[in-house]
């Protein structure tokens, strides 16, 4: 059974409407249910991105596959969808590490989907959204601090 990671901890998966792969996505509105879109690759060409943008108002959840621990394209896609006005749920799944949860949340993901094995290997207490976290490159350097010159 799938385990979801949110800012409140672990929770069971509550999405009941299923997923549609991008290739099966129709432009015809279907008001009977909220769409769940399953993106198996985070790189989309402009045509696919436009297609998703057209159905955003009736999309309840978009699940984006993270291929490897260093794959930032899923984060970029999440940010692009938020910038396009998507307000529904964004879910990351695949190769996710607890220490990247803050990155995922800052990119626009609402939750992370784990397999039972992933949840056992990375328990609830490892998944924290560090609200006061700032990337090292954004921390202002104190005035007059020594800079590395490359010489001894």
Task: Locate predicted features.
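N-terminal, charge-rich interaction modules
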Residues: 1-29
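Glycine/Thr-rich beta-alpha phosphate-binding loop at enzyme active sites
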Residues: 34-83, 132
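Catalytic cores of alpha/beta
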Residues: 49-54, 97-111
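C-terminal helical cap(s) of enzyme catalytic domains, especially alpha/beta-barrels
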Residues: 121-150
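Hydrophobic faces of well-ordered beta-strands that scaffold small-molecule active sites
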Residues: 18-23, 33-40, 60-64, 88-92, ...
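Long, distal/terminal scaffolding or interaction modules
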Residues: 76, 80-82, 87, 97, ...
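Glycine-rich phosphate-binding active-site loops on the catalytic face of alpha/beta enzymes
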Residues: 107-127
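Phosphate/adenylate-binding glycine loop and adjacent helical scaffold
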Residues: 3-14, 37-45, 128, 147
